[in-house]
Amino acid sequence: MDQRLLVTEEINAGSELIQRLNATLPIQAAFWLKDAYEGQWYLYLASDQVTDGTIREGYGEVIESYNQKPDVYLTPLQVKLISLDDPLAKEALDIYERYPGYAPTFLGARTFGGISIEEGYLYPQSIMAPASSPAS
């Protein structure tokens, strides 16, 4: 299993990507997870604009935002877009609701959104975009 730790540069690269993406694909929850079985770090980005029908366009936005400022510490292949209905997004949003604030959250080995993780990092809610209002 990969024993690699998440480093500050990866966290910062993810934060910059989230902030660029918010202009075209608002992100309401973002977190790095290291799956206990795969042992790989992935950056999960949850948006109310991501659905089965829009996922392809969403990844296009990720690539476009990444290409604005490529970073050696993050590639688009490490990014997983999810909807707010995904159990992982729901878990992150629940943490934001229970512990509002501007501090990041480090996660130890546990079950997160129904999967076993070795570690995780939840970005502070302060860098997220607000959820879209439903059309009236």
Task: Give the residues covered by each predicted segment.
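Short, flexible beta-strand-to-coil junctions
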Residues: 33-38, 47-49, 126-127
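Short, non-transmembrane amphipathic alpha-helical segments
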Residues: 53-74
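Short secondary-structure junctions
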Residues: 19-28, 69-74
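Short edge beta-strands and adjacent turn/loop segments
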Residues: 24-41
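A short interface-forming secondary-structure element
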Residues: 44-56
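N-terminal presequence-like segments and adjacent domain-start helices
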Residues: 1-13
